[in-house]
């Protein structure tokens, strides 16, 4: 069985609106408010990551196509005011590296090997998203090609 088919890279279309902190405890409905505002502006949201801190703040990070950054920033400015959030920041110097293959869910250790390979190469992972056939990592745009080459070597994939 082939565990991995390929790596994928995406440098040109991503930007991230990151570290959006809500200063409201029990922030029920905040994600709905945020993503409704983005949807109403036709902003296509890709990877989403949410964490709740021990202090009760919510931190939501997500990626959008670079073409949607201005619209997303406008939405975020309004959301910050409406929800009394602590603010937000964007990072347009990111890319996504993914491992793709049908055997992901049945072969333990794929994620560990991916993350170890990237760590050995000095590639810092900023976000992680998984599905049954894909592991995707957001990394600095300058690290994308190096990460892809290292993953190809580690998993013995063809170019």
Identify the role of each PLM range.
Residues 1-159:
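A conserved regulatory-domain signal marking ACT and ACT-like small-molecule sensing domains
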């Amino acid at each position: 069985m082939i565990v991995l088919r390929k790596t994928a890279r995406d440098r040109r279309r991503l930007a991230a609106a990151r570290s959006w902190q809500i200063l409201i405890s029990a922030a029920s409905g905040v994600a709905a408010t945020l993503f409704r505002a983005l949807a109403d502006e036709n902003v296509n949201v890709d990877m989403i990551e949410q964490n709740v801190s021990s202090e009760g703040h919510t931190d939501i990070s997500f990626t959008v196509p670079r073409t949607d950054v201005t619209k997303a920033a406008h939405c975020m400015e309004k959301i910050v005011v409406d929800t009394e959030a602590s603010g937000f920041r964007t990072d347009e110097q990111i890319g996504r590296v993914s491992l793709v293959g049908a055997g992901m869910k049945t072969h333990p250790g794929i994620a560990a090997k991916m993350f170890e390979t990237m760590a050995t190469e000095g590639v810092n992972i900023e976000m992680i998203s998984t599905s049954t056939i894909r592991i995707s990592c957001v990394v600095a745009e300058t690290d994308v090609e190096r990460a892809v080459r290292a993953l190809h070597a580690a998993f013995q994939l063809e170019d």
